[in-house]
């Protein structure tokens, strides 16, 4: 599947949370809570928290984890885009990430912003990046250790590459899909109420969409449908059914989008 995420029309470039079922099932993409607990003291493993809710990290995080504030560290608030290559490299080095580091990201809310953060790593060509399957929800439910001390790691030496634009979709791409001038399929991963225009944004969010509704031709698969009750991704067969129900089978390019980008 050729999957891209939307940038344009007021949306930030977003994380590739919708992937092929084969990719989600691969052990080189996800790590378990058991694996991470065994590797908490591994000097070649760096843990990064990217949560939606402010203050979650400070109240308690996976031991050794470094906090990335999605609205400050991973984006440029002026350009309304992902962090620049230079700023992202500085962030990673400051966080102790080197060329031989295995980086594991996790967060709250079904790993919404953690998965988006992993996508930013992917855009800049950083290798050995994993997502903790189940995120904070599963880690806490299993009563695994939490720490409230901030981590100050030794600086790393990673070098990030120029942004891979093939992983991104831009406004002309979306317009072409909406006007049926391409075979690209559009997937809106927001809630059904957002998709149907009943609300402008999720409850409690201050930053609203300019207009309610969805891009013409887009199908709706809310992000939460991709995960099980414990926060882990559903099985490959389950995901095939979820996306197959709206005509997404991986045979055509897909563009995902949401409100400002991070959920998709």
Please report, for each region that a protein language model flagged, where it lies by residue.
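Solvent-exposed loop/turn segments at secondary-structure junctions
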Residues: 52-55, 71-75, 109-112, 136-138, ...
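Bacterial N-terminal signal peptides that target proteins for export
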Residues: 1-10
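Flexible, polar/low-complexity N-terminal or interdomain linker segments that lie immediately upstream
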Residues: 12, 19, 23-55, 136-211
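Second-shell loop/turn segments in exported
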Residues: 26, 73-79, 104-108, 119, ...
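Thiolate-centered catalytic microenvironments shared by cysteine-dependent enzyme domains
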Residues: 83-181, 198-199, 213, 259, ...
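Helix-loop module immediately N-terminal to the HCX5R catalytic loop
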Residues: 75-102, 219-254
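Loop/turn elements at helix/coil->beta-strand transitions in domains of secreted/extracellular proteins
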Residues: 43-46, 99-102, 127, 181-185, ...
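N-terminal, post-signal-peptide region of Sec/Tat-exported proteins
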Residues: 46-83, 89
């Amino acid at each position: 599947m050729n999957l891209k995420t939307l940038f344009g029309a007021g949306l930030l470039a977003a994380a590739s949370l919708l992937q092929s079922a084969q990719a989600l099932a691969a052990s080189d993409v996800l790590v378990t809570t058991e694996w991470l607990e065994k590797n908490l003291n591994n000097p070649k493993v760096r843990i990064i928290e990217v949560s939606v809710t402010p203050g979650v990290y400070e109240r308690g995080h996976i031991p050794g984890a470094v906090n990335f504030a999605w609205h400050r560290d991973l984006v440029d608030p002026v350009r309304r885009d992902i962090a620049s290559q230079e700023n992202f490299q500085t962030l990673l080095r400051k966080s102790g990430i080197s060329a031989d580091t295995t980086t594991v990201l996790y967060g709250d809310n079904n790993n919404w912003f953690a998965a988006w953060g992993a996508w930013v790593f992917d855009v800049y060509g950083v290798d050995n990046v994993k997502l903790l399957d189940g995120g904070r929800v599963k880690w806490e439910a299993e009563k695994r250790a939490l720490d409230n001390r901030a981590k100050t790691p030794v600086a790393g030496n990673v070098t990030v590459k120029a942004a891979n634009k093939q992983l991104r979709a831009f406004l002309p791409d979306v317009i072409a899909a909406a006007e049926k001038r391409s075979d690209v399929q559009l997937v809106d991963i927001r809630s059904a109420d957002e998709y149907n225009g009943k609300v402008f944004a999720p409850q409690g969010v201050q930053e609203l969409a300019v207009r309610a509704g969805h891009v013409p031709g887009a199908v709706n698969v809310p992000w939460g449908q991709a995960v099980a009750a414990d926060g882990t991704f559903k099985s490959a067969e389950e995901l095939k059914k979820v996306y197959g129900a709206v005509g997404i089978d991986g045979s055509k390019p897909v563009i995902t989008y949401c409100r400002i980008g991070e959920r998709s």
